[in-house]
Amino acid sequence: MAAAVAVAGPSMEVEQDLPGFRFHPTEEELLDFYLSRVVLGKKLHFNIIGTLNIYRHDPWDLPGMAKIGEREWYFFVPRDRKAGNGGRPNRTTERGFWKATGSDRAIRSSGDPKRVIGLKKTLVFYQGRAPRGTKTDWVMNEYRLPDYGAARAAAPPPKEDMVLCKIYRKATPLKELEQRASAMEEMQRGSSHGDYTATRASLVHDASASTGDDYFSSDDVHDSGFLIQSSSSSAAPSGSSSKNGGAGAPREAKKEEADVTVTVASATSLQLPAVSQLPSLQLPAMDWLQDPFLTQLRSPWQDQHCLSPYAHLLYY
């Protein structure tokens, strides 16, 4: 990938394409070369890191404002304090705020581990207003030069109160992705079960509406294939018809002439179907000659000469 880099010449800046160029500086390079030069007022020959007040923009808008970067974006940010020198920086944006995580970490020189070249602060962006807010996956590393005080009296004073910020999105762990996927599967299973329950309830409602005034629940249909009213519940309509002077007799005749009659009762007046409504079980008649005990007692000689009246009664 070719990166467009602005090169500062003697009279003007010329933008050049550098094929294969990637900007992945180390923390020591960011502090000891880029930030220290900007703070001291030295001009860089390569305009790679732009100056921007990132707190006036949301983090998802910053990648389009960076000079360079694919997954990491760098900015020089002037420090905006709430109450004069030494106050707490204002890190509030239009739709959220940046919240620090932990304490600052000292960055030491690789050549001299005893020398601290800067401090690093890690912040996470939250949507909403402090102290409440929704945590996002946008992370910022803020680099600043250390304050040596009187020990660095001989050093040139800084001309600008500037920090260097690195913006990137935190990679989601595989475990969290698996948890999200399982949660989505559970939601889909729950929605499908809810659709099935709603469909079954609608079918039950339609069936109960077609039977007249008798209603039943979906649990009744699940427990029994077909239900009938008990004698106590079925006796009520006959009593009411007798009170009306026999006006319900034609209705009863019409119901008996119907080919199929489905009567559904409530769960408190259910009973098993009557025996008279079930078809009779057809079984073959028993043949006494097939009894093994009686077959042993029977012989042709007995058939001709010794048949008793009892034998005649059994075999003939």
From Swiss-Prot:
Regions recorded as binding DNA: 117-176
Induction of the gene: Induced by drought stress, salt stress and abscisic acid (ABA).
Domain of life: Eukaryota
Classification via Pfam families: NAM
Residue span, NAC domain: 17-170
Localization per Swiss-Prot or TrEMBL: Nucleus
Residue ranges of the region described as Disordered: 229-260
Keywords recorded for this protein, A-Z: DNA-binding, Nucleus, Stress response, Transcription, Transcription regulation
MF term (GO), any: sequence-specific DNA binding
GO cellular component term, pick one: nucleus
TM region positions: none
Chief location: nucleus
PROSITE patterns named in the record: NAC
InterPro entries in UniProt: NAC-dom, NAC_dom_sf
Extent of Low complexity compositional bias: 230-244
Additional record remark: Plants overexpressing NAC022 exhibit enhanced tolerance to drought stress and salt stress.
Function: Transcription activator that binds sequence-specific DNA motifs. Involved in stress response. Plays a positive role in drought and salt stress tolerance through the modulation of abscisic acid-mediated signaling.
Notes on the domains: The NAC domain includes a DNA binding domain and a dimerization domain.
Protein name: NAC domain-containing protein 22
Provenance organism: Oryza sativa subsp. japonica
Lineage: Eukaryota, Viridiplantae, Streptophyta, Embryophyta, Tracheophyta
